[in-house]
Every structure is written in structure tokens, then in C-alpha cells.
């Protein structure tokens, strides 16, 4: 009887382990010619036993890559070039919107080539992103109390929005609004919770992510350095994605949330959900004040 119990236990243990390994192998197979890049990431973290948690994080990202895509090809690159000329010109903001809308006639979004992330992502980018996320979690001030599982969901992702370009977004966005946190190290209460820091940054972002336009930007593919804080868009989706990237670059555990339609009106809406400890979240709109007061720590 004891032997049967041990046998069943080993079978169960093996099946649980193989399920994860099967999913990992499935993605590695789907990655085709890019398999060596993904395997390089895994091997990198296998070299040092101290990186065992980073290895788990790498597996988590790779196993969840199916369904996540990125633009590739010359059309999107040409679109970026033309968009940069418009956005960083001396034109008034409404003129920029008109020109960006007209640019979509020359570069229709349906014509942009895209591929699954697992087939194009580079090992160096993924390793850099994982290391940066771990530094923010373990060495930063605003997410020390969250679990590894929450870390994987709220901080680890290598991009913040679908079709975001693979670039150095964390380091580029990290300095934004840092002046608002200069005095926090002298206040024990403010320095021990992400609530007040996130609130201060969110207020500071008002001039960064909120734009007054006469005519809306119809659509864009500008989630890329150097466009992040320069997009002439007043949509809550763009505002929320930008604020999300900025908050995450600073080491806040944050996610994107939305409703497709309100029960009383025909509109969608989106907002940020910031994890302030292992079981409490605060909700805010990027650049808007105040936060929900009932969620104060």
C-alpha cells in the first residue's frame, strides 16, 4: 500500500512538473529560428544558483508570450520616422493631430506587419528587462512587500501595451517627475508606502499625459521611445498606458484596468490599478487627482 502511495505521488509530481515544461517547450518550438535567443535567456539564469527566481521569472514570461505581438518591417519603421518629424516640429498640437491622422492614410494600420513576440524578441532585451524589474522589486522602495506571483503580474512584463516597441523604456521614463520624491526619504510614513509617492507622481503627470485637443487622434502606434510623453492624444487609453509605463519604470506594482462599456452610457474607460501591499489596490486615472480616498493606507 505504501509503495502504491509513493508511486501515485511521484506520478502526480511528475505530471505537475511536466505540464509547465510542456508549455515551455511548446513556446520554444513555436519560436522557430528565435529559439536560440529564448534558450540563451534560460541558460543565462541557470548558470548561477542565486538566479533561480529570475529563471522562474524568465520561464513565466516565455510561457505567456503566445498572443503577444510586435510590429516589424519597413512600413512601421517609416511610420515612426514620419511621425517623429511631425511630433517634434514647431507645429501647434492640433496641426500635429491632423497630420498624424493623415499619416494613417499613407500607412494604414492594417498594412503593418506583426509577429509573435517569441519569434522576434532578443535575449539581451529580455535579460535586461528581467534584471531591471528585479532591481525595482528587491532594491526599490515601492514594492518590497509584494509576493513573487504579484511581481510577475505587476512589475515583470517586458512591455506595458500590445505592439510596444522593444527599447529602453524603463531607463528613459524613470527620471520623469523624480523631483516630486526628493523629500520622501525624510518622512517615515510617506517613505514606507507607495500610496503617497504614486499620488504625487500622478499629480505631476497632469501636464505630461493630459492634452487639450479640438480633434481627437484617431489611432496611433507610438508606444515607443521617444514618443511616450509627446503623443498628442487625449484618449484615456493613451493616457493610462503612458502613466502605467512611467509608474512601472519607477518600481511601482501597477496594472492596466478597463471597462468596455458603462452600464449607463456607450463609452469605454481605462485606469490604473496600483498594488500598495499584498492585498490592497488603489485606483487612479493617469494625471488626475484625487485618488480614491477610501484606499488611503
Regions found by a protein language model. Give the residues of each.
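N-terminal accessory/pre-domain segments preceding catalytic cores
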Residues: 16-207, 249, 278-281, 297
